[in-house]
């Protein structure tokens, strides 16, 4: 385990709630001040199938973009689905590689995970917490960006849902029920994410409404 629990909140995290809005648009959900946005999908996984992109899984039946909800592609009986409320490990590896080139503090990053999950590691439970929109209280961990995909559970593979470097150059945010992750930052960062061949990413806008699966009641 390399991510370490924070005993107190660093300024970039303690001030985070002041820089977030209280609405349901991408620009309000992620910190104000960033100018470009993307949505990255967790790949589809299921019994007997290899990981697939949403677009591949839809096979042309639905046009997949940054506004697509997973439930648009499948019915309730389907056992195939992307991971929910976490960042897929393969996606995390790619994101950490790309994001590293767009911050001055890649070894000094913060990772937030919802405190309501069962099975969290004992050291995670001892971390300081911060409140995000919609009453989401999040434990705060710190470490190198390359460790963002580290599991925060005693048994299981869930990783932190929010990432932010100490210089606040970008933000990665994923709600409790999200099957994807939103990213905000510079235009150069988002261009690099959209150009990556090993993740499924779509350009989002500040005014785009965060889709319903990201905020289930």
Could you say what each language-model-derived stretch is?
Residues 174-217:
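Alpha-helical oligomerization segments
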């Amino acid at each position: 385990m390399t991510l370490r629990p924070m005993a107190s909140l660093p300024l970039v995290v303690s001030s985070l709630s002041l820089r977030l809005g209280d609405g349901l648009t991408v620009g309000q959900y992620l910190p104000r001040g960033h100018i470009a946005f993307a949505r990255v999908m967790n790949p589809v996984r299921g019994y007997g199938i290899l990981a697939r992109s949403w677009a591949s899984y839809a096979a042309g039946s639905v046009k997949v973009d940054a506004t697509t909800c997973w439930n648009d592609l499948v019915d309730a009986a389907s056992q195939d689905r992307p991971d929910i409320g976490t960042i897929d490990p393969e996606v995390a590896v790619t994101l950490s590689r790309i994001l590293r080139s767009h911050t001055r503090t890649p070894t000094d990053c913060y990772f937030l995970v919802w405190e309501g999950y069962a099975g969290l590691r004992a050291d995670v439970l001892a971390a300081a917490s911060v409140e995000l929109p919609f009453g989401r209280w999040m434990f705060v961990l710190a470490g190198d960006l390359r460790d963002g995909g580290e599991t925060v559970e005693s048994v299981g593979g869930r990783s932190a849902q929010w990432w932010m470097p100490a210089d606040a150059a970008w933000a990665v945010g994923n709600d409790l029920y999200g099957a994807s992750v939103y990213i905000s930052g510079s235009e150069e960062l988002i261009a690099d994410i959209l150009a990556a061949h090993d993740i499924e990413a779509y350009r989002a806008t500040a005014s785009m409404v965060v889709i319903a699966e990201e905020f289930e009641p």
